[in-house]
Amino acid sequence: MVDDKDLKIPEHVAIILDGNGRWARAKGMPRSYGHVKGCDNLEKISDVAIEIGIKYLTVYAFSTENWKRSKEEINGLMKLFRQYLKKCKKMADKNHMRITVLGDPTAFDEDIQESIREVQEYSAQYNEHFFQIALNYGSRDEIKRAVNKIADDVRAGKITGEISEDIIASYLDTAGLPDPDLLIRTSGEQRLSNYLLWQLAYTEFVFTDVAWPDFHREELMDAIRQYNHRDRRYGGVK
C-alpha cells in the first residue's frame, strides 16, 4: 500500500460537481440550500487541491442543459454565481491562481459576463495554479463553436492544409491546458454528461457515491489513491 506522502499527484483534475439538490432534499431542505453548500465546498476544495500539489483544477458547475431547471432554481444559481465571482479576485491573490471560465458566457446577464471578464483579466497575472470553472458549458457546444471558428479561419486563409488534432485543440475552450489526468464525479452517477468529451480521451475516471457538499479532503485523497493504482497506457502496451 502506497503511503500518502508517496502518492503521485495528478497534474490536472477535473470534477463533475453533482448531487447538491439530492443532498439537500435528503436533509429536508430545498435544493437551493444544497447549491449554497456546494458553492462553499468548491472554495474549500480548490484550496485543498493547491495544498496537495494539483496544478490544474477544472470543475463542471453549470451545463448548457441546466437551463431546463425551474426558474426559481435558475435564479438562485445566478445569485450564487454573482456572489462567487465577487470572491474570485481574492481567491486568485491568495493562491496565485489564474481563473478561467469555460463555456459560452453570452447566455448570462451582462453583469455576470462583466464579472467573468474582470476575473479572467485580473487573474491572468498568475501562472502558478490554474482553476477552470465550466459555466454554461457543454462539450458538444464547445466543439461546435470550435468548428465554426476553424471554418471561418479557413475561409479567411488563416488556416491552410489539413486540420490536425492540435489545431482543433487550439480552438477549444481549454486551449493551452493539458488534458485531465483524473476525472471525479460525485453522488454516484456514472456518466460524463457532455463534459470535456474531447479532453477526456485518456483520462482515468473515479466515481464516488459521496454528494458534492460532503466531498472533502479525505474523499479527494481517496480518489487520488485510486488513481495511483491505475496503469495508464494511452492505448499502448507495457
Regions found by a protein language model. Name each.
Residues 1-238:
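Flexible, compositionally biased loop and terminal segments
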